[in-house]
Amino acid sequence: MKLNWKKATFSNTYKLYDNGREVGELVDKTFSSISTGSLLNKKFRFETKGFLKQTTDVFDVETNKKVGSITYNGFRSKATATFNNETFVWKYENIWNSKWSFNQREKALVTATLSSKGGTAVSKTEEVVYLITALFINNYYKKLALAAMIAIFIPIWMASIN
């Protein structure tokens, strides 16, 4: 499966497309620990908890059952997801953070190329939860990078005003 996604500049919603047809979305509310995602009529909820060492639980919205979890590897831009006792690793594939992969036992199940307002993902699995989770992790690290930039540049900007 090959998906494209787009996100408007100040939007919290990623729209997912398959051959130009909308097939899902990932909605990330600002200042909320809960995000929702849907793909091919399957809906998932992502609940992030913790402060310095955050984790995310993945729920099937229809059954309200926990189907997986995500553990982040700090600022190293790597995450581990677990579904049914199977471990998956999400990681960037280049130093520009414009390509990432979602792997099981060193085999890439999902690969993606990013642009400023979207990207393209190729999935070698029919499990939609893996693809939507990989997109969620990508968004998590983009938000983390933005927060770090704000934390660094606001003091610099404030010092330059004085």
Tell where the protein language model's regions lie, with residue ranges.
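Short hydrophobic interaction/assembly module
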Residues: 43-74
